[in-house]
Regions:
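The conserved beta1-alpha1 loop
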Residues: 17-19, 84, 192
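Conserved HGGG/HGGXW glycine-rich cap/lid loop of the alpha/beta-hydrolase fold
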Residues: 6-51
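Conserved alpha/beta-hydrolase catalytic His-Asp/Glu region
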Residues: 116, 133-186
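Conserved loop-alpha-helix segment in the C-terminal half of the alpha/beta-hydrolase fold
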Residues: 184-221, 227
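Conserved hydrolase catalytic core segment
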Residues: 77-119
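Alpha/beta-hydrolase fold catalytic core
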Residues: 1-14, 36-39, 72, 76-77, ...
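Conserved catalytic-core motifs of eukaryotic protein kinase domains, centered on the activation segment
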Residues: 26-28, 52-58, 116-119, 201-202
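Active-site loop/oxyanion-hole signature of alpha/beta-hydrolase fold enzymes
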Residues: 36, 43-82, 235
Length: 243
């Protein structure tokens, strides 16, 4: 599996992992800030998302394996791993599998154990593939902050890819993960949108931070923080520079 990716800069590596239903374009507003700060920035499209090829299983457990393969392909030793939404599931699995590859893990508006905000994607999971061409316009209306990121899912083929990706999401893949992740000793941080309606601060972010023993920073904005408030996210991320 060769993941489509953006790769720029020559400093310490930062790996940016998007979630559902976005793509590596989620990070376009943040990448220039990291480059100016002197980092190498690698932002892939997860398998089956954006411009990356699909597979029978594009769940987050499989994604973690492909992300590790990407680190090997690019000869990246240890990275600062920053992930959003269900991409944080892939990031947690990667960190537990190969803690020696992760310098720091930053979880942004992400999953906590089996809390993956599945109610928000349930309608997509049950969408009739025969009507797939109608899916992207519906999502563009519902998810206005990221409507420009949904271009990869235009038309029947794009809609079918998105339905398949939704059906591969399995919250059981991070059940019991929190204690294991904390035991790795990897430095952990959480950054969260103050108005996240999908994975709220009080019911997800704060319990996750407490369980991980990790600092939590609240940034003004909703669930799709890297798009809604890139300046605020960049400031939060770079306040403690990845070494």
């Amino acid at each position: 599996m060769r993941l489509a990716r953006d790769d720029a800069g020559k400093g310490a590596p930062v790996l940016l992992v998007h979630g559902f239903p976005t793509s590596r374009r989620l990070w376009l507003g943040l990448t220039p800030e990291f480059l100016r700060a002197g980092f190498r920035v690698v932002a892939p499209d997860l398998a089956g998302y954006g411009e990356s090829p699909g597979a029978p299983d594009v769940g987050m457990e499989s994604q973690a394996g492909w992300l590790l393969a990407l680190l090997d392909e690019l000869d990246l030793g240890r990275v600062t791993l920053i992930a959003h939404d269900v991409g944080t599931a892939a990031a947690q699995i990667l960190a537990v599998r190969a803690p020696e590859r992760v310098r720091e893990l930053v979880l942004m508006d992400g999953v906590y154990e089996t809390e993956w905000a599945m109610a928000a994607v349930e309608s997509i999971r049950s969408w009739n593939p025969e009507d797939a061409a109608r899916l992207q316009p519906v999502l563009a209306r519902r998810l206005r902050p990221i409507r420009a990121l949904l271009d990869a899912y235009v038309g029947e083929e794009g809609g079918k890819r998105l339905i398949h990706a939704a059906r591969c999401l399995d919250p059981r893949q991070t059940e019991g993960m929190t204690a294991t992740l904390r035991a790795t000793g990897i430095p952990l941080r959480l950054i969260w949108g103050s108005d996240d309606a999908f994975l709220p601060v009080d019911t997800v972010a704060k319990p996750l931070a407490a369980a991980l023993g990790a600092p939590l920073e609240i940034v003004p904005g909703g669930h799709f923080l890297p798009v809604e408030n890139p300046a605020g996210v960049a400031a939060a991320l770079l306040r403690r520079r990845p070494d």
